Amino acid sequence: MKNSLLLYAEDETNGEASTCGRILIFLSWVLVVLTMPFSLLVCFKVVQEYERAVIFRLGRLMQGGAKGPGIFFILPCIDAYARVDLRTRTYDVPPQEVLTKDSVTVSVDAVVYYRVSNATVSIANVENAHHSTRLLAQTTLRNTMGTRHLHEILSERMTISGSMQLSLDEATEAWGIKVERVEIKDVRLPVQLQRAMAAEAEAAREARAKVIAAEGEQKASRALREASEVIGDSPAALQLRYLQTLNTISAEKNSTIVFPLPIDILTYFMKSKEAFVPNA
């Protein structure tokens, strides 16, 4: 019984509001007719190709959704409208101090590209869609970075940007906002951490250089051993190497006089050494 009385009271209130609204609309039309043609300057409005107009009549959204682009008509005194820009906007997220998952404090900033996808919803569902989106972008940046390790933040920016874009787009859909893109601009580390990372990188480079030098010396010693074996097995190769050495020494501009030993004597000494080693 009580619910029936409440429903009856609501219907009666709506009926009275509807009757009052019809009277005000009629009076507004009378005002337009009486003030012709000056009223036309007030009644006709123009919105651009990239804009839409959300019209309220007596505080209620008009049927048919947002108007535009082009000319639309409003009644004076009872109609109000809001222009909504549909173009893509950019928002530079200010640097946010974030504590990463491995307890490192970093400063991160980003840029967000977004636009209004539903003009009516962006006006009716939220007081200031742009301001709300910007605040949400800051909190989303902090929350996303707080779940990542430092090496992930430095090496997986594209993945993190995509994750932020999906989170923002899902949250702002109820506001009539479409988040098109999110980009991580810069990740600033503490000075002490930068120095430690630079020292670590320098030590790693020095270690790699030492390994490469050791491998080079090993290959060179192996090549020298193989060359000495070839020269020892071939007297002609020994003589050719001897002549190359004499040619190199004589080509240098110095005052040193070199008296080369005959190759036969060198061969004799080498054979004597080979004969001495087995006897030992």
From Swiss-Prot:
Instruction: Report keywords, A-Z.
Output: Membrane, Transmembrane, Transmembrane helix
Name assigned to this protein: Band 7 protein AGAP004871
Q: Where in the cell is it found?
A: Membrane
User: Which Gene3D superfamilies does its entry note?
Assistant: 6.10.250.2090, Band 7 domain
Q: Which family does it belong to?
A: Belongs to the band 7/mec-2 family.
Stated membrane topology is: Single-pass membrane protein
Q: Which residues cross the membrane?
A: 23-43
Task: Say yes or no: keyword Translocase present.
Answer: no
Q: Which organism is it from?
A: Anopheles gambiae
Q: One cellular component GO annotation, for this chain's record?
A: plasma membrane
